[in-house]
Amino acid sequence: MIKDMIASIEQFAQTQADFPVYDCLGERRTYGQLKRDSDSIAAFIDSLALLAKSPVLVFGAQTYDMLATFVALTKSGHAYIPVDVHSAPERILAIIEIAKPSLIIAIEEFPLTIEGISLVSLSEIESAKLAEMPYERTHSVKGDDNYYIIFTSGTTGQPKGVQISHDNLLSFTNWMIEDAAFDVPKQPQMLAQPPYSFDLSVMYWAPTLALGGTLFALPKELVADFKQLFTTIAQLPVGIWTSTPSFADMAMLSDDFCQAKMPALTHFYFDGEELTVSTARKLFERFPSAKIINAYGPTEATVALSAIEITREMVDNYTRLPIGYPKPDSPTYIIDEDGKELASGEQGEIIVTGPAVSKGYLNNPEKTAEAFFTFKGQPAYHTGDIGSLTEDNILLYGGRLDFQIKYAGYRIELEDVSQQLNQSPMVASAVAVPRYNKEHKVQNLLAYIVVKDGVKERFDRELELTKAIKASVKDHMMSYMMPSKFLYRDSLPLTPNGKIDIKTLINEVNNR
């Protein structure tokens, strides 16, 4: 068990100073370098005399200097707000307006001119590193101090800044490095794919730094070139893969993504969106010896609150895979619309309690009051997810409360429709979306479909293909759930975080 994230990193700087902490296509940085660089940057930040414990926005990609700056800010007592280089200017402005950071550190060129907030460039960070200033940690982030603040998309379009404290982070990290499901080895070799602005990134960097491992990052130019990206990934000596299931689906478009070509890859950690039976089955075919761990949890409960190793038996017997056993320190409950706790097997809203629950949204008391509360004497959070608990305390996922629609008199869960379509042996990926009329009522259901290789060639017309897909799922799909129109695509759009961009598809079919 670790008691201080920075102390853990500092220990490895003493015991394995020359061991790589970061590797970007062979360009390496060691634990000793991370200690020296973060000390120097922390001393530089202290010299700026910022307001104590004020948040600092850090703009960039998955580079070593981002990592060193994060560690430096933690040492100097400031929470960091990671903002990805691909963020839209409007979003960056909204984050700045809400967070009111005391400083902006631009590891990449900053796209905006902001009055009233000092900006530190990469050249200044490089100069600070060259100064090699010693640093004594007297006011580092600890306890309930904010460690990082990650902005998620709000339902109104306004981002919400989730405050994660040092204690929140320790609750998650200690569970992950000790839980048998994750089976994290010492000195883990982790793929660092999700951007730092997505809290799934914490699932790779926190256990890696806590156990003295190496992060294998990818340059941002490579991420845009999918063919080259997966050719490169196949050559990396990574042992643990952390991503959304959608990113793994994309990886499986490459024939090189298999156990024969990547024998070191033994663990897959999934979170951020639902892991489908179809994706898990394909992964077992590609990596017969691998462990597949399905984790679940909102950003507001520090990355994940439950996890389970997916077995072949689960893939054969479940239509929706279980999302795990809740963390021991985070009692998880199912409640009805009146807030009453439901019994095992009953479906309702998933709420999480315990020390991993955030203190709320930064500078947003109204939204905080809506989502955060106290349950059985512990801090609690409304996930907005539908689920149930089995008698064995396994959490089952039932979709999103806000992705439920009323259609033809039936209440339909969009993710359930997508799941059913994904059961077809002809479908590689499917998403159901509603089309609304002028009265904002659901007019009909549509489905975006990506078929498996070679399927289209078997049919002369799309109409015949649609009939065949419908026939392949009709035995386990209610007729009222069947989309009236299928739209075929070569791929589905992804958000910067690697999730299928359902909102873009909904806007597309509704001409928004």
Swiss-Prot record:
One family name in Pfam for this protein: AMP-binding_C
UniProt cross-references to PROSITE patterns, sorted A to Z: AMP_BINDING
Pathway field: Cell wall biogenesis; lipoteichoic acid biosynthesis
Transmembrane segments: none
Keyword Acetylation: no
Binding site for D-alanine: D199, V303, K499
InterPro entries: AA_adenyl_dom (IPR010071), AMP-bd_C (IPR025110), AMP-bd_C_sf (IPR045851), AMP-binding_CS (IPR020845), AMP-dep_synth/lig_dom (IPR000873), ANL_N_sf (IPR042099), DltA (IPR010072), DltA-like (IPR044507)
EC number: 6.2.1.54
Keywords tagged on the record: ATP-binding, Cytoplasm, Ligase, Nucleotide-binding
Catalytic activity: holo-[D-alanyl-carrier protein] + D-alanine + ATP = D-alanyl-[D-alanyl-carrier protein] + AMP + diphosphate
Annotated positions binding ATP: T152, S153, N294, A295, Y296, G297, P298, T299, D385, Y397, G398, G399, R400, K499
Gene3D superfamilies: 3.30.300.30, N-terminal domain of ligase-like
Protein name, per record: D-alanine--D-alanyl carrier protein ligase
